[in-house]
């Protein structure tokens, strides 16, 4: 299976949800709302909003939980996955999810102060799969 690289720009729907796997690996789940701007004649308007679950691992997860808050506009790069699911009542659906390689605040409408951490923040080398 080939990874599909994506870059998303959108708004964080809630504060990051940080937890730790049974193996002790930090993981943060985020929900990102992405609304494209579309040209309608002489004016711009909002297109349909898409929602993505974004998963961050290790140091990136901890940094996201320490830094980000609901409403922040983010730039996310990662690998897209489409997950199939079935609800309790038997309905089937699909969900778009992104395993984040990197993320940060969008500076288009905000400013940020950067604080460097030592080392690589506990991140695996780029391209390493998340823990199983």
Segments (PLM) and residue ranges:
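Acidic, gly/ser/pro-rich intrinsically disordered tails
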Residues: 1-4, 18-24, 39-45, 62, ...
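Hydrophobic core residues within well-ordered beta-strands of beta-rich domains
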Residues: 6, 10-12, 26-28, 50, ...
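OB-fold and OB-like beta-barrel modules that bind single-stranded nucleic acids
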Residues: 8-12, 32, 70-82, 100
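Conserved positions in beta-strands of structured domains
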Residues: 13, 17-19, 57, 81-83, ...
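Short coil/turn motifs at secondary-structure junctions
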Residues: 15, 35-39, 59, 83-85, ...
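OB-fold (S1/OB) nucleic-acid-binding surfaces
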Residues: 25-51
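Beta-rich strand-turn-strand
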Residues: 57-93
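A short hydrophobic beta-strand segment most commonly corresponding to one strand
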Residues: 95-105
